[in-house]
UniProtKB/Swiss-Prot annotation:
Residues 1-16 form the signal peptide. GO terms for biological process: arachidonate secretion; lipid catabolic process; phospholipid metabolic process. PROSITE patterns: PA2_ASP (PS00119), PA2_HIS (PS00118). Keywords: Disulfide bond, Myotoxin, Secreted, Signal, Toxin. The record marks K121, R124 as: Important residue of the cationic membrane-docking site (MDoS). SUPFAM superfamilies: Phospholipase A2, PLA2 (SSF48619). Belongs to the phospholipase A2 family. Group II subfamily. K49 sub-subfamily. It comes from the Eukaryota. Monomer. This is Basic phospholipase A2 homolog Tbo-K49. The lineage of its organism: Eukaryota, Metazoa, Chordata, Craniata, Vertebrata. The record marks F130 as: Hydrophobic membrane-disruption site (MDiS).
């Protein structure tokens, strides 16, 4: 099952330490990260930053911006340590570079939870054809 999870996430191009990121999203939202967020809107998934469609899509935009600031990290291969304590994500990583990655993933998971009211099922699988490029800075 774990192998299937990893393959599914890699196929849709989610950035971040995929196992940890997926767990965080599931813990914060109760939603399956692959089916709910991996191809959502114009910013969730492998393409570059585009003009966000709504607050949920903006979460992915900000996540990409957060990852852009990381140095010497491989968001697909690197993993970090975190825990779920009292319904909160706690980044426990001692390596500063990996702790930053954890904080980026924590922020997007919390952002998804806080913006569940903006989630539009019609954007769940967006082909990105009509997404507009943005000059909006990170």
């Amino acid at each position: 099952m774990r192998t299937l999870w990893i393959m599914a996430v890699l196929l849709v191009g989610v950035e971040g330490s995929v196992i940890e990121l997926g767990k965080m999203i599931l813990q914060e939202t109760g939603k399956n990260p692959v089916t709910y967020y991996s191809a959502y809107g114009c910013n969730c998934g492998p393409l570059g930053r585009r003009k966000p469609l709504d607050a949920t899509d903006r979460c992915c935009f900000m996540h990409k911006c957060c990852y852009k600031k990381l140095t010497d990290s491989n968001p697909i291969k690197d993993s970090y340590s975190y825990s779920w304590e009292n319904k909160a994500i706690v980044c426990k990583e001692k390596n500063p570079r990996l702790k930053e990655m954890c904080e980026c993933d924590k922020a997007v998971a919390i952002c998804f939870r806080e913006n569940m009211g903006t989630y539009n099922k019609k954007e769940r699988i967006n082909t990105k054809i009509f997404c507009k490029k943005t000059s909006e800075p990170c």
